[in-house]
Each structure stands twice: as C-alpha cells, then as structure tokens.
Amino acid sequence: MFRKEIKVLDCTIRDGGLINNYQFTESFVKAVYAAICDSGVDIIEMGKKLVESAEYPRTKYGEWNYCDEDVLKRVVGSYQGRSQPKIAVMFDIGRIDINGLSDKKDSVVDMIRTACYVKQIDKALDVVKRCKDKGYETTLNIMAVSAAIETEVIEALEGVANTPEVDYLYLVDSYGAFYSEQVTHYINLYKKYVPIQKMGFHGHNNIQLAYANTQQCIIDGMNLLDTTINGMGRGAGNCPTELLLGFLRNPKYEVRPIYEVIQNEFVPLRKVMEWGYNDIYGISGLLNQHPRDGMKWRSDKAKAENCHDFYEICTKAVTGD
C-alpha cells in the first residue's frame, strides 16, 4: 500500500536488546545501521538512554541501554549509505537524567521517544516538553493500554491534547494482545481526544498479528510504524521490517539490504538468542499478560515447551482459582 506520508521506524536494537540486556557487539549494531541506511528506512532507534543505577549496572547491561553520545557517533560515522536515517533513542520514566540531556545541536540523536504507562502520563508529558525545549523531535509511547482502564486512558489522552510538544502519539500493543478490531477502536479513541496529533503504532507478535495489526493501522490512517529486522524483539517479537517494506510498495525502500543483514548477522544470532512466536508467548498474548513470565518460563530448559502447564498456571492467576 503506497502512501508517501508513511514512515518506518526500525527499533531492532532497542526492542531486541530486551532479550539480551543490550549485549550486542558494536560490529553487529554497525551492520544493522548500514542495512537501515541502504534500505531507506526513515528512522532507527539505537536503544534506550537510561542512567546507570543499581537496577541497571553497566556490568550487566550493554552500551545500547545507555546510548552514550560517543558510542552513537561511532556507529553513525561508520557508514554513508544511500540514505541517512534519523536517530532515535528511548526514555523510560523514572530511569533517566533529563537534566543531563544535551541540546540537539550537540547530539547525533534526532528523536527521543518517551515510554510510559497510563498512570505515569503527567511525568512523561513533562519529559516530552523538556526534550522539545532542547530541540528534539518527540514521541509519547503509552504502553500496555490493553490492560488499562479506558477512562484512565481517556484522561491521559486529554493531557496529550494539551501538550503540543508531542510530535507523535503512539498506540503500543505491549502484550501482543490486540486484534484488528481493537486496533481500530483505540485509533478512533485517540483521534477523538487528540484530533490533531500525528500517530504511530508499535506491535508485538504474541498472537501472530503484529504484521496484520500494522497493516490495519495503515488502513486507519497511522503514518509512523515500528518494525524490527527479522521480527527480533522481546518475547514473540515485532512486525518484521522486511515484510512491511515489501507491503508498502514505496520505491524509496529497498528490502535487499535487510535480507542481507538477516543472512549474515541474524541467522547466526538465532543460535544463541531466541525470539519469535511460540506457544508460551501465544498464551501470554491470549490472556493479555506481560510476557515477562513467559520469558522466564522459556529460560528453564526443563519446562520451556510445557505449554499446557504454563496455561494452567496463568489461567489460575487470572481467575484466582
């Protein structure tokens, strides 16, 4: 489906880093960056920009959890391709140092994406305002709306409507639980309460609908779409970059570099990292639950494939039986 307003944001490093604590080698990240440059993808998210803490020590987490300026400059300066994507990083509310953020003129970062839950909306909007004051393009990614009370979602949207510093408002299917009807429902809800806002979508593939739901977002008028190469991301992963580029039929995109980096980098990586659909993550999506329990279950080789046992435990937790 060709529509020139549509932009693709590849978040392979940021979402994929949730699998391995951002322990990607610099050569791997440079290979991903080069593929994104040559593919014509509009934006690449290089990771999270968190502060080191007892929760997130550098002894446990890799460079892409912090996205220090010198590290990003090494990657961006390593390749000049057929296009130069904008550089994005993600903020998590409560885990950042907004006072230490450089002005845009002193950074290779173009866009800061602020992720929050509905109950954190006031803090998130303050962060967005301060990022905009420093010259950055901004997105607000409201997570886990499928598990939120709709009246609270509406209240959050009313706050966004009064915050013009938000360049893009994101619908995020954090648990990979949405069906297309729910996607349309939330898009209409967002448009009702924030009618002038540009919007984006970030899907997860727990019930194997990330690609289909991204297509539904296009039909419903969203123009900024998140993807990951080979669908690599937390748990069941995300909408694959290579599939969406093919679907969009936009001549500015070239899918061959994406398949090349999959063959050279991602296929070997699959031998040591797991991502993509399986029945454990499917259960998490069907029950609209955070995938952390599924990921913990999969990490235990003795029971990793015991989907019936996992379902029994999860449904008892939901029903209270």
Features from the language model and the residues they span:
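Catalytic cores and adjacent flexible loops of soluble metabolic enzymes
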Residues: M1-D321
